[in-house]
């Protein structure tokens, strides 16, 4: 497991006074003001002075960023927080996305299907993206108990049920072409 968790990404500048768009990945975006944030290398530290909600993101003022040029230089900077600064998982079905990256993806018989590449939230719930073992296009699955019944972070694997979307099954009387 990684020592630091990706918690937000800095977007484009907002205005001319150094504010930035901020895309938060945690359940409590306002908690960003309490966390010690760093860039990916850990060398640069950030402190959120103010944070307010906007349409599909937040607008933040970061300590030491006073103008648009300084804000622009931070565009697409990922912000990390030390794992020990975050609350512990509330239950056994709660995971940090960072802990799922790189896990083996297996079917219910234990056959290797691929490797977890990413987790996405497109607004209707988390979606798991994995790279198939034999190569090819990545595959997406809803990150639900039905589609992903087993998450074994210490064991380095997840178990998936690939065909869990009944809407993709054609009706029995569908024409065969």
Curated annotation (Swiss-Prot):
Keywords: Chaperone, Cytoplasm, Ribosome biogenesis, rRNA processing
Transmembrane segments: none
Coiled coil: none
Domain spans labelled PRC barrel: 92-166
One Gene Ontology term, aspect cellular component: cytoplasm
Gene Ontology process terms (BP): ribosomal small subunit biogenesis; rRNA processing
One Pfam family in the UniProt entry: PRC_RimM
GO molecular function: ribosome binding
Keyword Cell division listed: no
Subcellular location: Cytoplasm
Alphabetical list of InterPro entries matching this protein: PRC_barrel-like_sf (IPR011033), PRC_RimM (IPR056792), RimM (IPR011961), RimM_N (IPR002676), RimM_N_sf (IPR036976), Transl_B-barrel_sf (IPR009000)
Complexes and interactors: Binds ribosomal protein uS19.
Function: An accessory protein needed during the final step in the assembly of 30S ribosomal subunit, possibly for assembly of the head region. Essential for efficient processing of 16S rRNA. May be needed both before and after RbfA during the maturation of 16S rRNA. It has affinity for free ribosomal 30S subunits but not for 70S ribosomes.
Family in the record: Belongs to the RimM family.
Written domain comment of the UniProt record: The PRC barrel domain binds ribosomal protein uS19.
NCBIfam families noted in UniProt: 16S_RimM
Protein name: Ribosome maturation factor RimM
Organism: Azorhizobium caulinodans (strain ATCC 43989 / DSM 5975 / JCM 20966 / LMG 6465 / NBRC 14845 / NCIMB 13405 / ORS 571)
Gene that encodes the chain: rimM
């Amino acid at each position: 497991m990684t020592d630091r968790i990706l918690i937000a990404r800095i977007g484009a500048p907002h205005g001319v006074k150094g504010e930035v768009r901020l895309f938060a990945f945690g359940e409590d975006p306002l908690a960003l003001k309490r966390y010690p944030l760093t860039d990916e290398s850990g060398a640069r530290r950030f402190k959120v002075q103010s944070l307010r909600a906007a349409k599909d993101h937040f607008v933040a003022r970061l300590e030491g960023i006073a103008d648009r040029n300084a804000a622009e230089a931070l565009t697409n900077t990922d912000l990390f927080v030390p794992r020990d600064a975050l609350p512990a998982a509330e239950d056994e079905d709660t995971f940090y996305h960072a802990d799922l990256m790189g896990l083996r993806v297996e079917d219910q018989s234990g056959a290797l299907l691929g490797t977890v590449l990413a987790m996405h939230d497109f607004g209707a719930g988390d979606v798991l993206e994995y790279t198939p073992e034999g190569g090819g296009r990545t595959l997406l699955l809803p990150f639900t108990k039905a589609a992903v019944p087993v998450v074994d972070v210490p064991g380095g694997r997840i178990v998936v049920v690939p065909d869990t979307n009944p809407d993709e099954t054609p009706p029995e009387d569908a024409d065969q072409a």
